[in-house]
Amino acid sequence: GDCAAVQYSGAGGRDPLFLAEHFIPFLNDHIKPLLVGRDVDAFLPNARFFDKLRIDGNLLHTAVRYGLSQALLDATALATGRLKTEVVCDEWQLPRVAESIPLFGQSGDDRYIAVDKMILKGIDVLPHALINNVEEKLGFKGEKLREYVRWLSDRILSKRTSARYYPTLHIDVYGTIGLIFDMDPLRCAQYIASLEKEAQGLPLYIEGPVDAGNKPDQIRLLTAITKELTRLGSGVKIVADEWCNTYQDIVDFTDAASCHMVQIKTPD
């Protein structure tokens, strides 16, 4: 299993930085004895055991739990002669749907050339774009992002190889919209709604419009933005990321109707 953490460890309410050399002795001392000789005929009981296990009063780091769950799932699949997908579907009593799921392509700072590559490859959702700086990427009035969304939709509509290619635009703004509008959810929503026409009919998702610095305020602000978008009749969708990491976080954000989508990173 890959004991991997998310890119921004320690930020937005996440577990602290995970360094393998610090945790290998811990795994050898505390986890290895629990794995040797363990029954792996079923995955779910083992996954739940390690997910709730506490050592010295602390839950295992999310990266450790992620790696362990991968290894345990693989072990169950090998032991029972099934694909890992089949194990998950069987144990959660889910249907086996033989269809592809949309893939999200991420450009990083290469937000122009990478988009051309994504268009040619027919990526379902694009481009992330890494809008994490007001001056260079968003603009103090949001003008740079507005121009980018228009360029993005123009590029897709002019360079796509099939009229059936109709991707979703998903842009992560790292809380920068909140910065230029003084964390006012109504002004944030009005700006976000104004981007819809620049997308020229392509579905538009804005991830992390604000970063409130804590979970309760993040839920409050995202809820207000989402409600205002609905009132304005906007089709732009809000994606929660920061402060929405664990299963319980996801429950809390969605119960508050604070967003249209949650950005779930598998190690979280």
Q: PLM features: residue spans?
A:
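Metal- or metallocofactor-binding catalytic centers and their adjacent structured scaffolds
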Residues: 2-82
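Catalytic core of soluble alpha/beta enzymes
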Residues: 158-268
